A protein has these predicted regions:
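Short glycine-rich or small-residue beta-strand-to-loop segments that form or flank ligand, phosphate
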Residues: 58-62, 90-101, 136-140
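Gly/Ser/Thr-rich loops at beta-strand to alpha-helix junctions
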Residues: 96-104, 143, 170-174
Length: 270
């Protein structure tokens, strides 16, 4: 069976299964333009799709050589609609993944481009006192740190006390068509590595005591063979660079709505 982190694909796979002749209960889906929203309403839907209860919004991206700004602006609006954050709610942005492995470096490279303000608000209140408090961390992976990412993020969250946590991670898709072309946003948290059979401790409200939102893009696809194999595009380095710019741009516009897109170039590499 193909593995996928995308709730939309999980729903499609369930509906296409020859064994499924009944209606999919506990799940609601609707489309609007380039957005598709899948709501897993209860335990029946969660069991059928193998995903936690919550909302999953997928946004289709244009070709990676298109305008980053437009994609970032669209993403910022989706984030606001999904989270409903108040103007002064503080946020901890977490870049999950292994920076040394290109298909898994989306999270760390995105955090590198996020405008972090917590230290600026404290150090330069006259200039940045009106900004939202945003902090960020890229906790690495268990194999290189010896510590679960969740444990490191929990320690950071206990110290900075954010209103919510926004996790960014590379995902796995079941279809080549969605590889590096679909952004999934969710209010149900995330279990890193689940799409490639290396599931780590889940980031959720239960484990971190604050709402956890997840945003990710599939950068690998299941090989679909008897051997454990995953595939990634030949130009994945360029794709990750583009995707991290889109995600960071959207996150920056969402967290700092009083800034224009070009304003962020003063502080971070956009």
């Amino acid at each position: 069976m193909l593995r996928t982190d995308l709730a939309l694909e999980a729903k499609e796979l369930w509906e296409k299964s020859a064994e499924r002749t009944t209606q999919l209960e506990g799940v609601r889906a609707r489309e609007q333009g380039n957005l598709t929203r899948v709501d897993i309403l209860d335990d029946r839907g969660a069991k059928a799709l193998g995903k936690p209860v919550g909302s999953y919004v997928t946004m289709e991206l244009p070709s990676f050589d298109r305008d980053v700004r437009k994609a970032a602006e669209d993403l910022a609006q989706v984030l606001q609609d999904l989270t409903g954050l108040e103007e002064k709610d503080s946020v901890l942005v977490v870049g999950l993944g292994n920076r040394a492995v290109t298909p898994d470096a989306l999270g760390p490279q995105t955090v590198d481009r996020v405008f972090l303000t917590r230290h600026l608000i404290r150090g330069l209140p006259d200039s940045f006192g009106s900004c939202r408090s945003v902090s960020g961390v890229a906790p690495g992976v268990l194999a290189t740190t010896g510590v679960e990412s969740l444990e490191l993020v929990r320690g950071a969250a206990e110290h900075v006390k954010p209103h919510c946590i926004l996790c960014v991670d590379a995902l796995a898709a079941g279809s080549m068509d969605r590889l590096c072309r679909t952004v999934q946003l969710s209010d149900a948290g995330i279990a890193p590595g689940s799409g490639v059979g290396n599931c780590r401790a889940a980031f959720s409200k239960d484990s971190l005591s604050v709402p956890v939102y997840a945003i990710g893009v599939p950068t690998v696809v299941d090989g679909g063979s008897d051997r454990p194999m995953i595939l990634t595009p030949r130009d994945i380095d360029e794709q990750i660079r583009y995707l991290s710019r889109v995600l960071a741009g959207g996150i920056n516009l969402f967290l700092h709505p009083n800034f224009a897109y070009d304003d962020f170039t003063q502080f971070v590499p956009m």
